């Protein structure tokens, strides 16, 4: 079977992890110990981090801070009510029209944009995330290793990742199973069906504790099953990786029947994110036509806000910033309070050539939405466009005190230093951005350029030299790991 680029990238990342000394040193799992002892949370996190480095480089990865912020707020609302609240999670989106979601080792959970658009309510989307969170908190990867009891850990990990981590696409699962060197695949798949039932049960409890409508889980899964029957061989990807049985649906229904009905309103951000994704789907003019048609339906004020937001995004994508500004003005008239409206307004002003107005909007928004990364990025870009590098540098320096691991902010800081003509600091900041993205060779190259910049002092050059030694050591360690594979 031919693997797509993302599949090949993830399998490569898995291979790097399995070739590492830590992986080899693990030895066989001790069946007398707990799942936590068989595969440590630290090892799971390391596997997940390695795979995420490859995912972030792939075009399918949706590098949209507003979508990521929404998913992480929603996911953290759920995970904070889990019995394993110490587990770290990161939620991200893949630009893929299929209906799928998947949990990877270490608490990384991916959601296809097609699934976000298919969810009719926020509780339905939360139900899917709760199910995936439960795969992580119940330590299904570690328990799968414990169940096997034979074969090398590397092979078991490959198979486990195929089942639990590589569910983003069926062909990736096949490829990872091939990397597992033909273990007893069917027995492990049967075991994973038990995990699906457990994830249903734990996820439902998590959904209820987080004050969502628990009927959202049954409604979404029933709709997926109906869709699968209608389209047979073209069933949603979620069904191929999360097989639904009548028994599972009946069990969900029985559990839900005993709970009182609770109507839970959707957040504004849920509707705005879906409108943004819809506006980015297909041809720009088709998106404009769809939102104009929906606006003509005279929806209630809450729904009108999402439609006008989506229409503004569609106009912007179609190269019509003046029309987009009219919709933003209508959102202001409706008194819609959201950081997504502020960033949209700033983007529209930038497209109309008014960088100063864009910067003013986001300066006003930053104190109100201090944790919104899209606001911080937008402010930096507006200040740079307005040729105000000193103001931008102050914003970047303050921001990196709170978010030192933000690769994008380091990259924006590098652009700021370039505008100021400070070459050493430009290359140093860009090196940090590359290092945080796992692009160590590019980071080393930037630091070498910083060494030759000719505009630094003794202290700055010493810092560059020290950081370059660290990066080179990491590169040497990785080369040794590949050699010992």
List each model region and its residues.
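Short alpha-helical catalytic segment bearing the HExxH-like zincin motif
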Residues: 110, 124-132, 136, 178, ...
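Catalytic Zn2+-binding segment of zinc metalloproteases
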Residues: 123, 133-150
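Membrane-active amphipathic alpha-helices enriched in small hydrophobic residues
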Residues: 153-168, 175-183
């Amino acid at each position: 079977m031919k693997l797509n680029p993302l599949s090949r990238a993830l399998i490569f990342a898995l291979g790097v992890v399995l070739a590492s000394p830590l992986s080899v040193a693990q030895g066989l799992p001790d069946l007398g110990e707990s799942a936590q002892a068989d595969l440590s949370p630290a090892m799971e996190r390391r596997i997940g981090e390695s795979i995420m480095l490859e995912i972030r480089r792939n075009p399918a990865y949706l590098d949209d801070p507003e979508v990521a912020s929404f998913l992480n707020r929603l996911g953290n609302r759920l995970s904070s009510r889990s019995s394993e609240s110490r587990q770290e999670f990161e939620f991200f989106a893949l630009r893929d029209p299929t209906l799928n979601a998947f949990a990877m080792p270490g608490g990384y959970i991916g959601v296809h944009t097609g699934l976000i658009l298919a969810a009719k309510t926020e509780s339905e989307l939360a139900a899917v995330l709760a199910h995936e969170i439960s795969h992580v908190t119940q330590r299904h990867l570690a328990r799968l290793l414990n169940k096997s009891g034979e074969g090398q850990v590397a092979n078991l990990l490959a198979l486990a990742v195929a089942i639990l981590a590589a569910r983003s696409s069926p062909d990736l699962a096949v490829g990872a199973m091939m990397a597992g060197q033909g273990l007893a695949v069917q027995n492990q798949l049967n075991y994973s069906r038990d995990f699906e039932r457990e994830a249903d049960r734990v996820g439902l409890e998590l959904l209820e504790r987080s004050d969502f409508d628990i009927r959202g889980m049954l409604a979404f899964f029933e709709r997926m099953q109906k869709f699968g029957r209608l389209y047979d061989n073209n069933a949603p990807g979620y069904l191929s990786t999360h097989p639904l049985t009548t028994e599972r649906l009946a069990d969900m229904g029985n559990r839900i029947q005993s709970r009182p009905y609770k109507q839970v309103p959707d957040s504004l951000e849920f509707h705005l994110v879906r409108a943004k994704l819809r506006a980015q789907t297909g041809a720009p003019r088709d998106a404009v036509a769809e939102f104009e048609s929906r606006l003509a339906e005279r929806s209630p004020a809450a729904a009108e806000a999402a439609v006008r937001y989506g229409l503004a995004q569609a106009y912007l994508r179609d190269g019509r910033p003046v029309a987009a500004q009219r919709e933003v003005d209508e959102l202001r008239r409706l008194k819609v309070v959201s950081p997504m409206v502020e960033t949209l307004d700033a983007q529209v002003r930038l497209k109309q050539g008014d960088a100063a107005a864009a910067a003013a909007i986001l300066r006003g928004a930053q104190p109100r939405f201090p944790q919104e990364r899209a606001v911080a990025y937008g402010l930096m870009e507006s200040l740079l466009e307005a040729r105000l590098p000193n103001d931008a540098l102050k914003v970047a320096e303050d921001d990196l005190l709170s978010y030192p691991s933000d690769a994008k902010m380091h990259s924006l800081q590098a652009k700021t230093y370039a505008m100021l003509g400070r070459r050493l600091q430009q290359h140093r900041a860009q090196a940090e951005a590359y290092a945080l993205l796992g692009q160590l060779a590019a980071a080393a190259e930037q630091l070498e350029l910083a060494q030759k910049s000719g505009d630094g002092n003794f202290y700055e050059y010493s810092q560059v030299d020290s950081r370059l030694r660290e990066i080179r050591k990491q590169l040497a360690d990785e080369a040794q790991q590949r050699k010992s594979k």
